[in-house]
């Protein structure tokens, strides 16, 4: 699994509440994977941040997939995202997949009550990190 990250406005930079990250996911790979969330104010384990994804797909006629879901299933949406689409992530896990043949770029903007990015992996998929 491959992705390239550029922290534009990390926690260490001066700002009031925003965190900004660019991510390039080459075709055939996943990002925000294993699925993670940051919707609970439970520091130091997890911070509460809403997030937006602004997607760019190359070539532009392509698509990618994004799923946003919660542990209790109250939110479970899987979207085919296209070039210039925006996805709002108010809560929950939010993995992104770039299918073969289509590179994916996205701009993440996150904000919350505390400007700290601590995420929690989905326990069902945590085994991937431990391999």
Region roles according to the model:
Residues 1-14, 107-131:
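Double-stranded beta-helix
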Residues 1-33:
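Surface-exposed beta-loop interaction hotspot
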Residues 18-21, 29-38, 43-44, 64-68:
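A short secondary-structure junction signal
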Residues 22-25, 45-72, 80, 88, ...:
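Short, conserved beta-strand element in jelly-roll/cupin
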Residues 36, 55, 65-67, 95-100, ...:
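Short beta-strand His + acidic residue motifs that chelate non-heme Fe in jelly-roll/DSBH
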Residues 60, 93-94, 111-114:
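Short, glycine-/Ser/Thr-/acidic-enriched flexible segments
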Residues 80-101:
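Conserved metal-binding segment of the jelly-roll/cupin
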């Amino acid at each position: 699994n491959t992705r390239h990250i550029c922290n534009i406005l990390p926690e260490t930079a001066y700002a009031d509440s925003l965190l900004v990250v660019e991510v390039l996911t080459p075709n055939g790979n996943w990002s925000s994977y294993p699925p993670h969330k940051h919707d609970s104010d439970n520091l130091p384990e997890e911070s509460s941040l809403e997030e937006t994804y602004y997607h760019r797909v190359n070539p532009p006629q392509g698509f990618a997939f994004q799923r946003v879901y919660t542990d209790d299933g109250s939110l479970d949406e899987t979207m085919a995202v296209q070039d210039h689409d925006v996805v709002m992530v108010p809560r929950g896990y939010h993995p992104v997949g770039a299918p073969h043949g289509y590179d994916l770029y996205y701009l993440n903007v996150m904000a919350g009550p505390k400007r700290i990015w601590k995420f929690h992996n989905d326990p069902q998929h945590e085994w991937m990190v431990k391999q």
